[in-house]
Regions:
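Polybasic, glycine- and aromatic-enriched phosphate-binding surface used to engage nucleic acids
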Residues: 1-108
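Non-catalytic DNA-recognition/assembly elements of restriction-modification systems
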Residues: 102-158
Length: 158
């Protein structure tokens, strides 16, 4: 095996310094790239994902985690590419075009709800998150019902 360029590194060491290596220690969202049901996990302990996962670090990451895990978040990603077996392919490129409004007034509330959901994992907290996200998108009761039924039916068919 021949190196691409001359370095003092051994063959198994990276030859190029990656500029984003510090992001692995920041609060982030980690998710599996391929799957039938979407789950976005919040990490603030510096965990690392496997090679089949993606991660995103940055501002308002708890807020984003709530939106992506909501019924509306799942609905926004419904048109992501799929595998031959129908599983979703949700890479960073699939999430970037999603229109996610940022409303600062919900930032602290969603952060608190995420903490509560992580520690307790209740349906009531999940509903509260979904309701806030529906309000952020300005959905009518009929639109909320449509999104809810669509996501639940698609999850049942998986």
């Amino acid at each position: 095996m021949k190196a691409r360029k001359r370095t003092n590194n051994k063959w198994f060491e990276t030859q190029d310094n990656i500029s984003y290596w510090e992001d692995f220690n920041k609060p982030k969202i980690i998710w599996k790239r391929i799957g039938s049901i979407l789950r976005f996990s919040y990490d603030d302990r510096g965990c690392l994902g496997l090679d089949s996962t993606c991660f995103a670090a940055g501002e308002h990451i708890e807020y984003l985690c709530c939106v992506l895990n909501s019924l509306m978040g799942h609905y926004l990603l419904k048109d992501s590419p799929r595998t031959g077996t129908g599983d979703l392919l949700v890479s960073v490129q699939a999430i970037e075009p999603a229109r996610i409004p940022y409303e600062a007034k919900y930032n602290d509330l969603l952060s608190d709800l995420l903490s509560r959901q992580i520690s307790e994992g209740t349906a009531a907290t999940e509903k509260e998150i979904n309701d806030i996200v529906f309000v952020m998108y300005g959905l009518s009761p009929i639109e909320r019902e449509y999104v809810t039924l669509y996501v639940k039916q698609s999850q049942q068919s998986q």
